From Swiss-Prot:
Keywords: Amino-acid biosynthesis, Aromatic amino acid biosynthesis, Lyase, Tryptophan biosynthesis. It comes from Oceanobacillus iheyensis (strain DSM 14371 / CIP 107618 / JCM 11309 / KCTC 3954 / HTE831). HAMAP family: Trp_synth_alpha (MF_00131). GO terms for cellular component: cytosol. Pfam families: Trp_syntA. This is Tryptophan synthase alpha chain.
Length: 262
């Protein structure tokens, strides 16, 4: 459970030279009652871990698809507490690692220590907080470490070499490579230097490197996975769930990791 569980699952994939696929879903989008069903479906479809967004009123890193999902989740009265309660209710039946993505403001209001303790109790394995600068993360990092929860850092293409090295050194679980500039979402044109960026991160990271932001096809997922250890796919997964297209999600995951869809 916790960081050790996430590390073990990802290590198994990388040692077998299999691409890691982490789908993102918004907790509470489609109802909190469906949360565990969706996690189970993604596990059965071939996901390595699940990234679970906590809805927030000012989601600075999210593109329009995920922002809309967040609004639907907020309309369903989704909170950190209700998400953790739902996760804890089926913790013993869940095998796949779960990573929460939230913003620093709701975590600060919840209380760093209480947040880490409750996440651990709910079976959360990792945390992503995209809007906290590395220079201000020590308090929350300490609480997460105490409860064996991986603190996953983001590495941006716009960061300096020195900053990337410091981020890579601190990252736990996996290093989340922001492979495009801007917010999440599909991209009609992907920056060609994404591959160079991912290869550079692979050289300096002691944990798996996953590319995220702007990946909407299995072809693109396979291309980027060739330069790193795998991908995180958010907007496309959220979109397909909203459309009720579970077959589309299954195909996207299977084709992204190089398996034939029957």
């Amino acid at each position: 459970m916790g960081k050790s569980k996430l590390d073990a699952v990802l290590k198994e994939k990388t040692q077998a030279k299999k691409p890691i696929f982490v789908p993102y879903i918004m907790a509470g989008d489609g109802g909190i009652d469906n949360l565990n069903k969706r996690i189970q479906f993604l596990e059965e479809a071939g996901a390595s871990a699940v990234e679970l967004g906590i809805p927030f009123s000012d989601p600075v890193a999210d593109g329009p698809v995920i922002q809309d999902a967040g609004q639907r989740a907020l309309a369903n009265k989704t909170t950190i507490g209700s998400v953790l309660e739902a996760l804890e209710s089926e913790k013993s039946q869940r095998n796949i690692p779960v990573v929460l993505m939230t913003y620093i403001n709701p975590v600060w209001k919840y209380g760093f220590e209480q947040f880490a303790r409750d996440c651990s109790q709910a079976g959360v394995d990792g945390i992503i907080i995209p809007d906290i600068p590395m220079e201000e993360e020590d308090d929350v990092a300490s609480s997460l470490t105490q409860h064996d929860i991986a603190f996953i850092r983001l590495a941006a293409m716009t960061s300096t070499e020195d900053r990337l090295e410091r981020i890579a050194k601190r990252s736990e679980g996996f290093l989340y490579a922001v492979s495009v500039t801007g917010t999440t979402g599909e991209r009609a044109q992907h920056e060609n230097d994404a591959f160079h960026f991912l290869e550079k991160l692979k050289q300096i990271s002691h944990v798996p490197v996953l590319a995220g932001f702007g990946i909407s096809t299995a072809e693109r997922a396979r291309e980027l996975s060739a330069a790193c250890d795998g991908v995180v796919v958010g907007s496309k997964i959220v979109q397909l769930f909203e459309q009720g297209d579970e077959d589309g999600i299954h195909s996207l995951i299977r084709e992204s990791i190089g398996e034939k869809v029957i």
